[in-house]
């Protein structure tokens, strides 16, 4: 059976920014509409893959956890072979896949996805790290296709200004889109889905 062309969506961001929570919400919202799968990257465990399975985000055979060992950004940039093999495996299992989400291991602001691994890149940062994060720059913040500023509900608790983050993000990204989000309440989720569907030419 001939496999259809597959959209690959990279999801990057620092540890704890909310990447796995975003994946879970995207799976729950889109799994009945699209044929989809997920590849997660963890340094020594399959924790993120297990989280998605436990939360019934997708059927178990649609999720593969890659143990990257050592440096997580090597697996998404310099040597993407493990991730490409995982995508191929999922595509063999599900020849009609519309897209696969590839979650990077927790990385720093300089990590980027190899073009052969990701057609569309989402980068997640979170407000709890402070409102200075957007102006620190780095490829994830300046060059990702969509920047997601997550956990806006904790802004007051950590003394972060969303206005400052909005201003600095516009300065760093120019015309590139970004969205403020709170995955607990699904705030911003509709905009993220619309971006994926539009830019990924799914609709």
From Swiss-Prot:
Record has Chaperone as a keyword: yes
Entry keyword set: Chaperone, Cytoplasm, GTP-binding, Nickel insertion, Nucleotide-binding
Taxonomy, superkingdom: Bacteria
A Pfam match: cobW
Sites where the protein binds GTP: 13-20
Gene Ontology terms: biological process: urea catabolic process
Alphabetized InterPro entries for the sequence: CobW/HypB/UreG_nucleotide-bd, P-loop_NTPase, UreG
MF (Gene Ontology): GTP binding; GTPase activity; nickel cation binding
Gene Ontology, cellular component aspect: cytoplasm
Subcellular location: Cytoplasm
Role summary: Facilitates the functional incorporation of the urease nickel metallocenter. This process requires GTP hydrolysis, probably effectuated by UreG.
NCBIfam families found in the cross-reference section: ureG
Assembly and binders: Homodimer. UreD, UreF and UreG form a complex that acts as a GTP-hydrolysis-dependent molecular chaperone, activating the urease apoprotein by helping to assemble the nickel containing metallocenter of UreC. The UreE protein probably delivers the nickel.
Family: Belongs to the SIMIBI class G3E GTPase family. UreG subfamily.
Protein name per its UniProtKB record: Urease accessory protein UreG
Organism: Psychromonas ingrahamii (strain DSM 17664 / CCUG 51855 / 37)
